[in-house]
């Protein structure tokens, strides 16, 4: 009887130990923070094709997190259509910023929000008179480009139910379809849109105003409360310090 009780207690202890294991422990032990990033979202994460190095606000954030953890950072190339799968498959410990969505939350954990943006449409500047409002883009004769796997792909279905939706796969981007004349418009974050209209003067933001305020956070493995709490508290502390 005592042997049986001991066996049950031992099994419980082992199970508890497995459940308590956290990415925070493995990161500290390995000395490396693996970060999944797409490298195609200006100004958050961009990969320089000449140097193969990443730059952007998210990259600065991840370098700072690794520094405070006392480990090295390793950026792992990811694509929007598989960025969630990279977390669940343990290809990286954390992602750079993604939009919080219910679909992603089903399989991945989200840290505290660290950035907020609105969604805006982009069109060719020469077509601004024709496409001056959101409603003008919601038409069966209009083609809206989206990038496969992004939150904008889902939003486009909601905002433009009458339009033709044309998805492109990374490394191609939706706005490139607009530039090439293969699509009439696309939607993106107000942050990226402001960068794109400077880089490509032929593009313009539809002056109808932003919609659908969205929140950015990093993705971490679902259920890893220790790691999630660590990063979330770190974000709040850095906000307090105006990082």
Can you annotate each of these PLM segments?
Residues 21, 71-75, 79-81, 99-104, ...:
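A conserved helix-loop-strand patch within extracytoplasmic ligand-binding domains
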Residues 22-98, 106:
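Extracytoplasmic small-molecule ligand-binding "clamshell" domains
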Residues 24, 54-58, 105-117, 205-208, ...:
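A structural signal for short loop-to-beta-strand junctions that line the ligand-binding cleft
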Residues 45-51, 62-71, 133-140, 149-168, ...:
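Ligand-binding cleft/hinge of the Venus flytrap
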Residues 59-60, 74-85, 166-180, 212-214:
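Short helix-initiation/N-cap motifs at beta->coil->alpha
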Residues 59-68, 127, 135, 141, ...:
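Extended ligand-binding regions for polar small-molecule ligands
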Residues 82-85, 98-106, 154-158, 179-212:
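A ligand-binding cleft/hinge motif common to bilobed small-molecule-binding domains
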Residues 116-120, 194-236:
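Periplasmic-binding protein-like
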């Amino acid at each position: 009887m005592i042997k049986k009780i001991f066996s049950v207690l031992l099994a419980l202890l082992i199970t508890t130990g497995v459940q308590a294991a956290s990415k925070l422990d493995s990161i500290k032990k390995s000395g490396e923070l693996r970060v999944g990033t797409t490298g195609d979202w200006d100004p958050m994460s961009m990969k320089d094709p000449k140097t193969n190095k990443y730059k952007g606000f998210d990259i600065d954030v991840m370098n700072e997190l690794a520094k405070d953890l006392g480990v090295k950072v390793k950026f792992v190339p990811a694509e929007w259509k598989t960025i969630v799968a990279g977390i669940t498959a343990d290809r990286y410990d954390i992602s750079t910023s993604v939009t919080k969505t219910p679909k992603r939350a089903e399989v991945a954990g989200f840290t505290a929000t660290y950035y907020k943006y609105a969604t805006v449409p982009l069109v060719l500047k020469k077509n601004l008179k024709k496409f001056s409002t959101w409603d003008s883009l919601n038409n069966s004769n209009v083609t809206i480009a989206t990038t496969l796997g992004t939150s904008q792909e889902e939003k486009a279905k909601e905002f433009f139910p009458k339009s033709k939706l044309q998805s492109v796969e990374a490394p191609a981007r939706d706005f490139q379809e607009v530039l090439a004349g293969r699509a009439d418009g696309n939607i993106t974050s107000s942050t990226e849109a402001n960068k794109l209209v400077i880089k490509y003067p032929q593009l313009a933001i539809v002056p109808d105003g932003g919609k659908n305020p969205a929140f950015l956070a990093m993705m971490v493995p679902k259920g890893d409360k220790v790691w999630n709490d660590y990063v979330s508290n770190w974000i709040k502390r850095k906000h307090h310090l105006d990082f």
